[in-house]
């Protein structure tokens, strides 16, 4: 203090100012240090500049292990990882969690039948696309638990879904394109069930040209159901976004959600209903009995096979088997009507077109679904330029899904989705497909462009380059697709 007083007296003599006047001038002039620390007016009041700093401050010790592929340029020239906005727990990496990677939020729903409502939608996508994607994201969790989800369109739902910008009322502001993609609130918290997506992201479905809504939504719904972030490799509940297709739960995700809610409940079996001896005598209605027990997948042939949303669906006698990345999914086989209400049983053929619509054939009729929503049918095959007996198999071929072939007996037709007609009502002979049997039950194309033809318990793999069946085929379907025991005598 003595030194400061001496310094002020010295300055007063140099400037020829009385000491009281010098002190008054120092108080009135703005402090250079304070001026440097104060942000520009536009930044001080900008809602975006303040929010993300508060949010990222609550994300402890997570950015050091982020792969470079997760980082994107920000408007300021720095880099930000694409990630969920739910803060990570500090003890996610502690020793206690190394064996059990999944982390629970401490809450769970006390019921298994939940409702959801979408309040606002992103501008890039059609509303029905968003609804279908949200339903698929919830289905990822319902397939491995007893949970069910039903959409409602008014009032308060258990899960409230919204697309919002910047500050939106929950003290977790969004930051514009990139960075924070979405966040959600856990069960038994003050905003339980709320899920918010950043409206300013470039939302897409099923591709990496933007941010895949299906993957982000499925991740956020994991939070809504009670899961925290995990450090397990390739887990859906990792805090950082990486595009993966098709979407699937990791073993860690599955263990976590089943720890909270258990495994899916199997429908109780009951004796098959008996028909009265007078059934049909006083009515012209036909009673359709759904099968109660699926056929043995290792002993059966299949009615139809199709690649739908990047997954394989095998159809038989009203049931469907769903394979993702070569693995049968939990909860399957299941009744096909679980996905496609009103679908007849059995189906003769099925395929998914380039627009994502799914076509089913039975007898002289066909049906079209947009996802799981029926949009057409039953309609006559004659509308497509086909006459006579049913379609036995349908094959979508080519990377653009623009080559569709219908097979029947030893004949085939090429179908044009744009005109909704076959190119010629007169079929060509299936001998054009070298090595493929004349009579087939089903056909599909894999992700690498190979075509598969099924007949009975066997399948033939067709090379699109050499335009013929590969050496070593046919092979049995059961062992190659469902891990069945290899038959003792296999026809080669």
UniProtKB/Swiss-Prot annotation:
Enzyme Commission numbers on file: 3.4.24.-
Cofactor(s) listed in the protein's UniProt record: Ca(2+); Zn(2+)
Note describing how the cofactor binds: Binds 1 Ca(2+) ion per subunit.
Compartments, record wording: Secreted, Extracellular space, Extracellular matrix
Main location group: secreted
SMART domains in the record: HX, ZnMc
Biological process according to GO: basement membrane organization; collagen catabolic process; collagen fibril organization; extracellular matrix organization; negative regulation of fat cell differentiation; proteolysis
Sequence positions that bind Ca(2+): 175-176, 178, 180
PTM description: The precursor is cleaved by a furin endopeptidase.
SUPFAM superfamilies per UniProt: Hemopexin-like domain (SSF50923), Metalloproteases ('zincins'), catalytic domain (SSF55486)
Propeptide: 36-101
Residues where Zn(2+) 2 binds: 84, 219, 223, 229
GO molecular function, one term: metallopeptidase activity
Ranges spanned by the short sequence motif Cysteine switch, renumbered to the chain: 82-89
Active site positions: 220
Database matches in CDD domains: HX, ZnMc_MMP
Top enzyme class: hydrolase
Residues annotated as binding Zn(2+) 1: 168, 170, 183, 196
GO cellular component assignments: extracellular matrix; extracellular region
N-terminal signal peptide: 1-35
Hemopexin repeat ranges per the UniProt record: 295-343, 344-386, 388-436, 437-484
Pfam families on file: Hemopexin, Peptidase_M10
Tissues expressing the protein: Specifically expressed in the mammary gland during apoptosis.
Keywords linked to the UniProt accession: Calcium, Cleavage on pair of basic residues, Collagen degradation, Disulfide bond, Extracellular matrix, Hydrolase, Metal-binding, Metalloprotease, Protease, Repeat, Secreted, Signal, Zinc, Zymogen
Family per similarity comment: Belongs to the peptidase M10A family.
The protein, known as: Stromelysin-3
Biological classification of the source: Eukaryota, Metazoa, Chordata, Craniata, Vertebrata
């Amino acid at each position: 203090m003595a030194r400061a007083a001496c310094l002020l007296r010295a300055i007063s003599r140099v400037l020829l100012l009385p000491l009281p006047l010098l002190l008054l001038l120092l108080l009135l002039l703005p402090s250079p240090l304070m001026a440097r620390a104060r942000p520009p007016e536009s930044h001080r009041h900008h809602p975006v500049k303040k929010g993300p700093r508060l949010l990222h401050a609550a994300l402890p010790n997570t950015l050091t292990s982020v792969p470079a592929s997760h980082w994107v340029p920000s408007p300021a020239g720095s880099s930000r990882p694409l990630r969920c906005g739910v803060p990570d727990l500090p003890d996610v990496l502690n020793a206690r969690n190394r064996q059990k990677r999944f982390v629970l939020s401490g809450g769970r729903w006390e019921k298994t039948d939940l409702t959801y409502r979408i309040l606002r939608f992103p501008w890039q996508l059609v509303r029905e696309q968003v609804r279908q994607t949200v339903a698929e994201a919830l289905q990822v969790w319902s397939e491995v638990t007893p949970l069910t989800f039903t959409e409602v369109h008014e009032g308060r739902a258990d899960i409230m879904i919204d697309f919002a910008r910047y500050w939106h009322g929950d003290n977790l502001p969004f930051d514009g394109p990139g960075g924070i993609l979405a966040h959600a609130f856990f069960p038994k918290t003050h905003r339980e069930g709320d899920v918010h997506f950043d409206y300013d992201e470039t939302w897409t479905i099923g591709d990496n040209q933007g941010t895949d809504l299906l993957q982000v939504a499925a991740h956020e719904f994991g939070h809504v159901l009670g899961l925290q972030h995990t450090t397990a490799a390739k887990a859906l509940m990792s805090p950082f976004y990486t595009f993966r297709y098709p979407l699937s739960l990791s073993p860690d995700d599955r263990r976590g959600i089943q720890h909270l809610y258990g495994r899916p409940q199997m429908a109780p079996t009951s004796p098959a209903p008996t028909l009265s001896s007078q059934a049909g005598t006083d009515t012209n209605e036909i009673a359709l009995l759904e099968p109660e027990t699926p056929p043995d997948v290792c002993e059966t042939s299949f009615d139809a096979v199709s690649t739908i949303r990047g997954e394989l669906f095998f159809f038989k006698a009203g049931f469907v088997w769903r394979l993702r990345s070569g693995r049968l999914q939990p909860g399957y086989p299941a009744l096909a009507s679980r996905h496609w209400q009103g679908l007849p049983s059995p189906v003769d053929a099925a395929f998914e077109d380039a627009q994502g619509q799914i076509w089913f054939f039975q007898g002289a009729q066909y049906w079209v679904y947009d996802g799981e929503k029926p949009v057409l049918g039953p309609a006559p095959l004659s509308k497509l330029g086909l006459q006579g007996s049913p379609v036995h198999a349908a094959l979508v071929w080519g990377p653009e899904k623009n080559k569709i072939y219908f097979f029947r007996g030893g004949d085939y037709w090429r179908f044009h989705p744009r005109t909704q007609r076959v190119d010629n009502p007169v079929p060509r002979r299936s001998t054009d497909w070298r090595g493929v049997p004349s009579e087939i039950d089903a056909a599909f194309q894999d992700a690498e462009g190979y075509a598969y033809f099924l007949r009975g318990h066997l399948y033939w793999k067709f090379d699109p380059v050499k335009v013929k069946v590969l050496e070593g085929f046919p092979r049995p379907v059961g062992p190659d697709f469902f891990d069945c025991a290899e038959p003792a005598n296999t026809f080669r």
